[in-house]
């Protein structure tokens, strides 16, 4: 098996090394990841300048681009032969609910799926993460399962793992995305010259976090596994929107 590993925390982040080491027991692992932390990069591609790649002493490839750049690069000609599966992570922090809209970790997995491969995004939930090995072992088991049981097309798995020893994990739950309240306001400061600068505020607290959500699974000590679909079309709105548009008169 050939496994492509990427992330958004950067090629030197602890989570990616632990993940790659664990997955190496299954086959050949190639790591292609950003040269620095690119959290929040979402699905952005670099289109206005070339990408530069540096191979590190440990064999990992460091790219001066986004997580999506890394996977796109790896799967469209940089790596030969092509991988069988993409695993993105292990992210240092949650990707729950609305977080998936901004997450470079999730985006890297989505790019892999967009380019035809099964893909998993895996994140640790907590501060000052201690138990990356827990997520790495779970990722390995999921890769084994997916090698024999293919995901539907355009589907990835978004996996969130409590920062606990494996022995304290209560099980795996299939979940839906919860939601957060709106983000906190921006934080305004001033640089040494007195000019205003702005920091994006922290994410909002949980809004929809009841039973069945990814938030709830984490709170109860479970691993949350949410299937995400690349097709974002809102099919249920078709009839209502069609009726609404029929009321619009366009005159030549």
Swiss-Prot record:
The enzyme's first-digit EC class, named in words, is hydrolase
UniProt keywords (A-Z) are: Cytoplasm, Hydrolase, Metal-binding, Nucleotide-binding
Catalytic reaction list = a ribonucleoside 5'-phosphate + H2O = a ribonucleoside + phosphate
Q: What is its EC number?
A: 3.1.3.5
Q: Which GO terms describe its molecular function?
A: 3'-nucleotidase activity; 5'-nucleotidase activity; exopolyphosphatase activity; metal ion binding; nucleotide binding
Entry binding sites for a divalent metal cation:
8-9, 39, 91
What domain of life does the UniProt record list for this protein's source?
A: Bacteria
Q: What's in the GO CC field?
A: cytoplasm
Q: Which InterPro entries does this one have? A: SurE (IPR030048), SurE-like_Pase/nucleotidase (IPR002828), SurE-like_sf (IPR036523)
Is Hydrolase one of the keywords UniProt gives this record?
A: yes
- Does Hydrolase count among this protein's keywords? yes
Q: Record's family? A: Belongs to the SurE nucleotidase family.
> Any idea what job this protein has?
Nucleotidase that shows phosphatase activity on nucleoside 5'-monophosphates.
Q: What protein does this entry describe?
A: 5'-nucleotidase SurE
Tell me which species this is from. Legionella pneumophila (strain Paris)
């Amino acid at each position: 098996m050939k496994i492509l590993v990427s992330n958004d925390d950067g090629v030197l982040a602890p989570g990616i090394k632990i993940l790659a080491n664990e997955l190496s027991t299954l086959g050949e692992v190639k790591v292609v990841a950003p040269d620095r932390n690119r959290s929040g990069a979402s699905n952005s591609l670099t289109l206005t300048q070339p990408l530069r790649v540096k191979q590190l002493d440990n064999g990992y490839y460091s790219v001066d681009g986004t997580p999506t750049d890394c996977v796109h690069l790896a799967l469209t000609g940089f790596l030969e032969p092509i991988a069988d599966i993409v695993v993105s992570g292990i992210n240092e922090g949650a990707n729950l609910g609305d977080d998936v809209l901004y997450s470079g970790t999730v985006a890297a997995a989505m790019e892999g799926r967009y380019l035809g491969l099964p893909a998993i995004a895996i994140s640790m939930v907590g501060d000052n993460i201690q138990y990356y090995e827990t997520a790495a072992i779970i990722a390995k088991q999921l890769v084994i399962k997916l090698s024999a049981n293919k995901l539907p097309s355009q589907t990835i798995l978004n996996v969130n793992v409590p920062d606990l020893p494996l022995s304290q994990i209560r099980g795996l739950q299939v979940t839906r995305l919860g939601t957060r309240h709106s983000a906190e306001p921006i934080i305004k400061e001033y640089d040494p010259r007195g000019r205003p600068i702005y920091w994006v505020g922290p994410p909002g607290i949980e809004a929809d976090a009841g039973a069945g959500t990814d938030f709830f699974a984490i709170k109860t000590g479970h691993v949350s596994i949410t299937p995400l679909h690349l097709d974002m079309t809102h099919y249920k709105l078709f009839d209502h929107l069609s009726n609404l548009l029929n009321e619009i008169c366009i005159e030549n």
